[in-house]
Amino acid sequence: MHKPRVLFLGRSTLDVLYRLDRMPEEDTKVYARELQTAPGGPALNAAVAHSLLGGRAMLISAVGGGPWAAPVRSQLRRHGVRLLDLARGTAYETPLCTVLANAANATRTIVNPPVSQVPLRHLGASWAAEMPSSWGRIPPVVLTDGFFLEETGALLAACKSAGAAICLDGGSWKPGTEELAGLLTAAICSERFAVPGQSGGANGNSDAVLEWFANRGVPYVAVTRGARSILASDRGRRFEVEVARIAATDTLGAGDVLHGAFCCHFALKPEFELALRRASEIATLSCRGPGAQAWARQPGGTVAESPQRALRSSL
């Protein structure tokens, strides 16, 4: 089986994770059950998940410098994820995010730092001119999380023109999403994704999201809803993907794992429903342990064989 190649574009962070028995009340002090720091961000986590499944991952992101950049770069090297840093040579610093994980109901709350105003590199439309030669040709699948669209829009359009499937990790609406829709092959959105002027939040209008993308020519659309079934549309055909019931201990990064696994499967066999079902299984598995990578590790700390076997069995 060849290694599927996928390009990921979007955000990288360093997350400081506090695992709590329950969320604290306002104006109180509490002690965490556990403290963990780990690189994060939708695109980074998806790229690492793709790599753990045996794929070749390339990441275009802003990492820059500052005290938090080193662990991010170290993790990418450890997992063989190749990086093109939009912030190279600038004063940009890797964002430090605080994550409160509530063990009582397996939810998480994230506090982001202020948005950086440091100008980043804008990529042109020529893959050969912009990318390292070692990256080879344009990959068959490209995922964007909606961050840095201004800096990467021309390259995304070039990838689309070359025949790549452009996929969106729609965690939330971001500036440029409407223009991006015309390039998309697939949009996989959170239930919190809301088109401006439409209802959103935890009980957002999933049907409206499916219709909005379909009306703009996106053939494959899905809305994830946590532990509830995934609602999806394959060129107008509606279906649901049931999510296995488990005793979830941590949902942090599960959506990112789903996107990385989807891209890995879709790059091998471009069948939307099959790739979505396989990705859902792996994302559910990721909720059994702490963090966005515990699903792929045995107790001894080595990468488990089961994810790769699951990938091969889907062919």
Regions picked out by a protein language model, each given a short descriptive name:
Residues 153-240:
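Conserved phosphate/ATP/ADP-binding segment of small-molecule kinases
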